[in-house]
């Protein structure tokens, strides 16, 4: 099959997938988002959105960043759940994506055979995209939404004047979501830009991976990962990155994906806004890395340019703008002056850079237990070790799995053992089982399953 036919087939698959979204069984609605933001508020917050104000310099004539597109993106991406398996100190993450409405799962990131046989304890965690501004803390949901709005507003603003929210003609906030893609680039002049050598997500030399959408998704490896997550096909967006600037719903999904998905060793923006990431002591020389809050979203999104001790003023000025936008949206969502001030007190910060001696640094230590420091009841954490083993397994679980049953099956599907998890540290004797491959499943909402090697 020639390249043109492959290109056409991927476009057809994208179109069919978009239609299929409307035909799938309904998934749980994101009530947190629905309770915090309305279409009327959206229109007041972003009156200069692309395609809604004057003659748009990038040619948009329809409301690309409409509230309807955002709402559809939030609801549809809520159907996705990601399982991440990691072994501390062992290269690779085994990541699976599941569509909850259909039960269909597919690999997002694979590992080598050596990973499976390495006896290092395995940690499993889940990223449920229904959790976007929708966890148990209404206060943190508001903080997360304000942080999300601040960052997408900054990335796309056509404004030029401070103070944020001051109502001037060039108010940065009023011009949020004005630009759809990065200035200076178009489909016709961008071949090869933002392309990095990457064996897993190789760039297509005929296209460019400049910033597109609310979060300004950039670089081939980000387009490839998002495409794999969304469509189980990395090449759809590697070959057709313009889809992110032509489909408003997909554009918002790209922003939510980037926001919710941890990219080792970075935590996700969602995690840091819900205090679900705790840095290891002594891992960082910069004390600012041990502060919590909004500053980390800046470090995750564009820290290499804006948040380093060596960052140029043109970039550190953007740190201040993000902070001001965040505080502005907190006020819109009902925070009073003292609550907004608290975002820079008691170990929290809205600024990833304050001076050459007080700035953030790169993230290190890809550990899921750090990334989920405060575990909510709907987050299942499981460890099984040693694996392989000849005698005993130790099963470590989070508190919410106490009372659940586990089952062990042989490689032809016959159940060979079952019991109740009565402790967060349970020893399981498999000494009498023949050597071979087994599968341990926990009877819980997510039914995590582990491949066990009996030697």
Can you annotate each of these PLM segments?
Residues 376-455:
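C-terminal outer-membrane/trafficking sorting elements
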Residues 257-274, 278, 293-294:
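GST-like fold's C-terminal all-alpha helical module
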Residues 1-29:
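Bacterial Sec-dependent N-terminal signal peptides
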Residues 80-82, 264-272, 335-338:
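Surface-exposed helix-capping loop/turn segments at secondary-structure junctions
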Residues 30-261, 289-293, 297-310:
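Peptidoglycan-targeting cell-wall enzymes and recognition modules
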Residues 29-56, 370, 382-384, 388, ...:
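Acidic/polar, low-complexity intrinsically disordered N-terminal segments immediately downstream
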Residues 128-133, 275-287:
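A Trp-anchored, charged/polar loop motif used as the substrate-binding/catalytic surface
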Residues 29-47, 279-288, 292-293, 299, ...:
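Extracellular low-complexity, O-glycosylation-prone Ser/Thr/Pro/Gly-rich "stalks"
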């Amino acid at each position: 099959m020639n390249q043109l036919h492959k290109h056409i087939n991927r476009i057809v698959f994208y179109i069919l997938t978009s239609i299929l979204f409307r035909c799938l069984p309904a998934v749980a609605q994101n009530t947190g988002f629905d309770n915090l933001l309305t279409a009327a508020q959206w229109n007041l917050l972003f009156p200069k959105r692309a395609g809604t104000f004057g003659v748009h310099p990038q040619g948009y004539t329809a409301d690309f960043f409409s509230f309807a597109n955002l709402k559809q993106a939030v609801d549809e991406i809520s159907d996705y759940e990601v399982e991440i398996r990691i072994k501390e100190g062992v290269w690779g993450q085994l990541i699976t994506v599941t569509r909850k409405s259909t039960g269909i799962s597919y690999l997002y990131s694979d590992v080598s055979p050596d990973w499976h046989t390495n006896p290092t304890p395995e940690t499993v965690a889940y990223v449920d995209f229904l959790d976007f501004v929708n966890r148990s803390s209404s206060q943190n949901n508001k903080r997360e939404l304000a942080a999300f709005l601040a960052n997408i507003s900054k990335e796309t603003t056509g404004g030029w004047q401070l103070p944020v929210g001051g109502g001037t003609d060039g108010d940065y906030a009023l011009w949020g979501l004005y630009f759809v893609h990065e200035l200076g680039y178009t489909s016709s002049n961008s071949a090869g830009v933002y392309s990095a050598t990457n064996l897993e997500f190789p760039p297509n030399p005929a296209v460019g991976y400049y910033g597109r959408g609310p979060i300004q998704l950039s670089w081939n490896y980000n387009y490839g990962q998002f495409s794999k997550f969304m469509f189980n096909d990395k090449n759809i967006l590697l070959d057709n990155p313009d889809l992110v600037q032509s489909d408003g719903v997909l554009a918002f999904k790209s922003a939510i994906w980037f926001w919710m998905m941890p990219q080792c060793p970075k935590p996700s923006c969602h995690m840091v806004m819900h205090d679900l990431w705790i840095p290891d002591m002594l891992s960082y020389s910069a004390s600012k890395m041990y502060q919590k809050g909004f500053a980390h979203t800046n470090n995750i999104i564009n820290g290499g340019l804006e948040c380093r001790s060596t960052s140029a003023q043109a970039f550190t000025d953007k740190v201040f703008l993000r902070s001001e936008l965040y505080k502005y949206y907190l006020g819109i969502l009902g925070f009073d002056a003292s609550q907004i001030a608290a975002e820079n007190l008691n170990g929290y910060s809205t600024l990833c850079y304050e001076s050459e001696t007080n700035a953030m640094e790169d993230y290190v230590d890809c550990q899921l237990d750090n990334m989920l420091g405060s575990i909510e009841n709907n987050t299942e954490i499981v460890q099984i070790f040693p694996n392989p083993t000849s005698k005993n397994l130790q099963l470590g679980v989070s508190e919410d799995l106490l009372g659940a049953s586990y089952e062990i099956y042989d490689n032809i599907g016959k159940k060979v053992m079952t019991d109740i998890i009565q402790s967060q540290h349970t020893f399981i004797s498999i000494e009498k089982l023949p050597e071979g491959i087994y599968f341990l499943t926990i009877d819980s909402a997510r039914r995590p399953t582990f491949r066990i090697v009996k030697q």
